[in-house]
Amino acid sequence: MVTPEDLECLKRIALMGGLNTPVFLKTISLGSELGFSPQTASRRLRSLEQQGFISRTLGTDGQQVTITHGGEDALRQEYCDYYRLFGRQEKSLMLNGTVQSGLGEGAYYMSLQPYADQFQRILGFTPFPGTLNIRLLPGATLQRKRLSSAEWKVVQGFESEGRTFGDVRCLPCFIRDVPCGIIIPGRTHYPEELIEVVSPEGLRKRFSLKDGDEVTIEVTL
């Protein structure tokens, strides 16, 4: 598990631009910014590298450091934790609906690694192999139209074994304090009263849900 000291160091590298491109740094300057000695800063970098959170290229007068996908995931998880603490103070949209059975296709698509990897980066979790299908109550369908103004993320499609898999739009949400994501396959015309949700665990089992049970989806706009 990443330590608070390692996470602070990782965040500093990200703020320097290490999420997108390699950044040049010296342990003495990094330590000064973090309140560490150069020796401690060097240990933090070695620890981050050993955990797979950064990659480094050492030089004679410093080093090039890049944050890996694993490091980005660690930062996203930290963001999700703070979002759960403070983000709910923002304007939220509550959508009420009832659980219903789907076609069982969600388990297959969530098991595809290119999709799963992107959901991990966007939502901060690897999706459970399956989705929760929800039919909105009559009063919630008007509320759903407001989702068009939300900041949807796009999970890129891909090709595999001669088959093309399309883009998927994704919107972070919560169901009973569990971070989830509303998904809309790009090639599918969903009825407005239907919502499909991915989550880090099986919500039916977690909350003992059965068809017809009412649930609330919370989306921060």
UniProtKB/Swiss-Prot annotation:
Gene3D superfamilies: Riboflavin kinase-like, Winged helix-like DNA-binding domain superfamily/Winged helix DNA-binding domain. Keywords: Flavoprotein, FMN, Kinase, Magnesium, Metal-binding, Nucleotide-binding, Transferase. One of its GO terms (biological process) is riboflavin biosynthetic process. It holds the Pfam family CTP-dep_RFKase. FMN binds at residues 188, 196. Transmembrane segments: none annotated. Pathway: Cofactor biosynthesis; FMN biosynthesis; FMN from riboflavin (CTP route): step 1/1. Its EC number is 2.7.1.161. It catalyses: riboflavin + CTP = CDP + FMN + H(+). Binds 1 Mg(2+) ion per subunit. PANTHER family: RIBOFLAVIN KINASE. Belongs to the archaeal riboflavin kinase family. HAMAP family: Riboflavin_kinase. Catalyzes the CTP-dependent phosphorylation of riboflavin (vitamin B2) to form flavin mononucleotide (FMN). This is Riboflavin kinase. It comes from Methanospirillum hungatei JF-1 (strain ATCC 27890 / DSM 864 / NBRC 100397 / JF-1). The gene is ribK.
